[in-house]
UniProtKB/Swiss-Prot annotation:
Reaction catalyzed: Hydrolysis of (1->4)-beta-D-glucosidic linkages in cellulose and cellotetraose, releasing cellobiose from the non-reducing ends of the chains
Organism: Agaricus bisporus (White button mushroom)
Region (Linker): 60-87
GO molecular function, one term: cellulose 1,4-beta-cellobiosidase activity
Protein name: Exoglucanase 3
Domain CBM1, chain residue ranges per copy: 21-59
Location of region: Disordered: 57-90
Active site annotation, chain numbering: D215, D393
UniProt entry tagged with the keyword Ion transport: no
Keywords: Carbohydrate metabolism, Cellulose degradation, Disulfide bond, Glycosidase, Hydrolase, Polysaccharide degradation, Signal
Described purpose of this protein according to its UniProt entry: Shows enzymatic activity towards crystalline cellulose. At long reaction times. It is also able to degrade carboxymethyl cellulose and barley B-glucan.
Region Catalytic, annotated ranges: 88-438
Gene: cel3
InterPro entries for the chain: Beta_cellobiohydrolase, Beta_cellobiohydrolase_sf, CBD_sf, Cellulose-bd_dom_fun, Glyco_hydro_6_CS
Length: 438
């Protein structure tokens, strides 16, 4: 499994590398590719995107995508990645993504409050960049129907985050949720999921992509020493499985959250993470619409760092692409579909954190690479903005019940309001430091 990742890394580092044929799963084409364009016996070169064509085993290569040796592969839509193939395919292919009117209103008001005309114009442009809608309380769920109706009228794809597990955010405090296990939280969560599924069922012609429960399963990999996480372990698993099954039944394409390179990307965490995700997949009945994994949700890591940030010392998976390429073969071997989406909404500026684990309103951050399906990797379906930039990570007020000490560290922007509320000063920083510039 590691040989495959190593081969991809070598090919990317040495563009002039040439061999007679690419091996199974090796690269065989793409913009700028100068290596071999023929595949080893028993495999066929298949275009995954404009930047990457891959040698797939003949029994996995669709007949319509077969190419002749030495030619540029034709445009095609394939499932990408390795391992089990979801029934949905890449949900972003050929789709326009719906813009949240709620976030657009937040951005418009924020831009109106900026006195610098140039910065205000840049800020206003953020409203045209699609982000996910977070359903972090059951009270927000009734709004989903209106969003779906609007998207249907425009023939657009809707992106949502399912985020309301009981005893949520078990290893931190800033985003503690409304449900507790001590107060029938798991059943309340299932009712919340049922309400989401019921809304989506009314719009079978609208494509929906969902990120499932940020941080939840990652906490079960690394933080079972925290009593709250240990107590929530079975409920997290049962809740995620329930959500996946219910949303699968109404055609939602799903990506389970898997933390980021500085969390599950450490070598010791990769295999346990892959095994946990595979267990969830099997226990949910191998749902055809569970497409894969979401990484870097609401975090700040680069997809492809120009050089390792000093805070990543000791981890060869120092950015999201290294993490993804290390995790993907383990997922595949464990029987989990290895397809990814990556949040780059606030990853425009690197080398600004004191510690890799600093996650709260990181000072000096900027908006990052815009959402696209031109990801440069067959493993990655899309670069996305899951976290709506400008909505706060957590309060710096140490008297708040949801105060987390990470939000008062020296590399956290302060003073900061409660998690999820608008943070004007931070939004202006994200706009000013955007890379690429707005």
């Amino acid at each position: 499994m590691f040989k495959f990742a190593a081969l991809l890394a070598l090919a990317s580092l040495v563009p002039g590398f040439v061999q007679a044929q690419s091996p199974v799963w090796g690269q065989c084409g793409g913009n700028g590719w100068t290596g071999p364009t023929t595949c080893a016996s028993g495999s066929t070169c298949v275009k995954q995107n404009d930047f990457y064509s891959q040698c797939l085993p003949n029994n996995q290569a669709p007949p319509s995508t077969t190419t002749q040796p030495g030619t540029t592969p034709p445009a095609t839509t394939t499932s990408g990645g390795t391992g089990p193939t979801s029934g949905a395919g890449n949900p972003y292919t050929g789709k326009t993504v719906w813009l949240s009117p709620f976030y657009a209103d937040e951005v418009a008001q924020a831009a109106a409050d900026i006195s610098n005309p140039s910065l205000a114009t840049k800020a206003a442009s953020v409203a045209k960049i699609p982000t996910f809608v977070w359903f972090d309380t059951v009270a927000k769920v009734p709004d989903l129907g209106g969003y779906l109706a609007d998207a249907r009228s425009k023939n657009q794809l809707v992106q949502i985050v399912v985020y309301d597990l009981p005893d949520r955010d078990c290893a931190a405090l800033a985003s503690n949720g409304e449900f507790s296990l001590a107060n029938d939280g798991l059943n309340k969560y299932k009712n919340y999921v049922d309400q989401i599924a019921a809304q989506i069922k009314q719009f079978p012609d609208v494509s929906v992509v969902a990120v499932i429960e940020p941080d939840s399963l990652a906490n079960l990999v690394t933080n079972l020493n925290v009593q709250k996480c240990a107590n929530a372990q079975s409920a997290y698993k049962e809740g995620v499985i329930y959500a996946v099954q219910k949303l699968n039944a109404v055609g939602v394409t799903m990506y389970i959250d898997a933390g980021h390179a500085g969390w599950l990307g450490w070598p010791a965490n990769l295999s346990p993470a892959a095994q946990l995700f595979a267990q969830i997949y099997r226990d949910a009945g191998s749902p055809r619409n569970l497409r894969g994994i979401a990484t870097n949700v609401a975090n700040f890591n680069a997809l492809r760092a120009s050089s390792p940030d000093p805070i990543t010392q000791g981890n060869s998976n120092y950015d999201e692409i290294h993490y993804i390429e290390a995790l993907a073969p383990m997922l595949s071997n464990a029987g989990f579909p290895a397809h990814f989406i990556v949040d780059q909404g606030r990853s425009g500026v690197q080398n600004i954190r004191d510690q890799w684990g600093d996650w709260c309103n990181v000072k000096g951050a900027g908006f990052g690479q815009r959402p696209t399906t031109n990801t440069g990797s067959s493993l990655i379906d899309a670069i996305v903005w899951v976290k709506p930039g400008g909505e706060c990570d957590g309060t710096s007020d140490n008297s708040s019940p949801r105060f987390d000490s990470h939000c008062s560290l020296s590399d956290a922007h302060q003073p900061a309001p409660e998690a999820g509320t608008w943070f004007q000063a931070y939004f202006e920083t994200l706009v000013a430091n955007a890379n690429p510039a707005l």
